[in-house]
């Protein structure tokens, strides 16, 4: 909530206030995340590799991307929707976190008169997001049949459209970007399944916080969602019935090359290029290695 005395008169003053929140919270949040990581017995890496300046830069990029949403809201929200918001009323299902109760009557403290103000645009554009202080896995969305779950980072709904945003603390220039688009399409499917197959997501985006770039992902239509549902159920049933290596033949996907922002620029010529750096190559039946141990040794 923007304090009344700090309410901005233009986008520049709103931007200064928003970015100042990073300075106020980044050190505490980083230290808490680091402590949580240190307590994880399965952690990988070295705390000395933590680049605090990089974290700060990515946080500022995230604020800039959200401010684009606020600017669009300020420019495009029609007066009818603005007046409806100003009247307040009963909270909707899963409202955007704003420090107030999630149910009951709610009158927005930012309401004004006349044309939309920047503090109103900030409040209206606020997305639903995962509570950073919530316990792990406590904000997962679960398939009605309880065999699939996922966690949305941001859900924007200010213009009546549903858009799911996935945040990536990366530049987006490596092979991991290959799966990010499919991950988002699965989120779209999960939303559809958990809304009685009635709500279809209107937009999907990946926000790469390294360069501060958006990547637009095509949102599946109803026909595609039905196909995804069938494929996912088949995969789930297959995973539950694997009894030997023959039931899950190894077929590594080729390495894909990307430039920043998750833009694909090529595919490796060697179809098994990723096998060169796979940590499980010594155990793989097709890895070309003998993983057997001497009789007097144990793994």
Can you describe what each PLM-predicted range is?
Residues 167-176:
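Short beta-strand-loop-alpha-helix junction that forms the active-site gateway
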Residues 1:
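Gly/serine-rich nucleotide phosphate-binding loop at the start of the catalytic core
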Residues 181-193:
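An active-site-proximal "capping" alpha-helix that borders the catalytic cofactor pocket
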Residues 130, 144-147, 176-177, 191-299:
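Metal-dependent nuclease catalytic regions and adjoining charged, substrate-binding loops involved
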Residues 4-164, 197-202:
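Catalytic cores of nuclease domains that cleave nucleic-acid phosphodiester backbones
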Residues 161, 170, 209-212:
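Short connector loops/turns at beta-strand edges and beta->alpha or beta->beta junctions
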Residues 58-61, 65, 186, 230-238:
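Long, highly charged amphipathic alpha-helices
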């Amino acid at each position: 909530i923007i304090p009344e005395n700090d309410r901005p008169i233009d986008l520049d003053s709103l931007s200064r206030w928003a970015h100042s929140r990073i300075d106020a919270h980044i050190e505490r949040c980083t230290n808490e995340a680091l402590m949580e990581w240190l307590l994880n017995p399965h952690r990988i890496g070295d705390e000395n590799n933590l680049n605090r300046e990089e974290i700060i830069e990515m946080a500022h990029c995230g604020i800039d991307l959200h401010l684009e949403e606020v600017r669009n809201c300020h420019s495009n929200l029609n007066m009818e929707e603005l007046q409806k918001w100003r009247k307040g009323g009963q909270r909707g299902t899963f409202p955007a976190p704003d420090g107030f109760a999630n149910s009951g009557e709610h009158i927005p403290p930012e309401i004004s008169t006349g044309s939309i103000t920047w503090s109103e645009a900030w409040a209206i554009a606020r997305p639903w997001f995962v509570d950073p202080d919530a316990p792990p896995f406590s904000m997962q969305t679960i398939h009605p049949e309880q065999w699939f779950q996922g966690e949305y980072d941001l859900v924007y709904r200010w213009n009546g459209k549903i858009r799911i945003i996935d945040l990536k603390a990366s530049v987006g220039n490596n092979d991991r970007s290959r799966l990010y688009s499919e991950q988002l399409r699965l989120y779209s499917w999960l939303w559809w399944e958990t809304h009685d197959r009635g709500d279809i997501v209107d937009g999907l985006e990946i926000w790469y916080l390294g360069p501060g770039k958006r990547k637009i992902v095509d949102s599946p239509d109803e026909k595609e969602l039905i196909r995804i549902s069938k494929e996912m159920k088949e995969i789930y049933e297959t995973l539950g019935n694997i009894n030997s290596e023959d039931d899950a033949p190894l077929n590594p996907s080729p390495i894909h090359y990307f430039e920043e922002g998750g833009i694909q620029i090529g595919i490796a010529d060697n179809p098994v290029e990723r096998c060169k750096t796979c940590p499980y190559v010594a155990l793989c039946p097709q890895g070309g290695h003998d993983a057997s141990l001497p009789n007097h040794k144990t793994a």
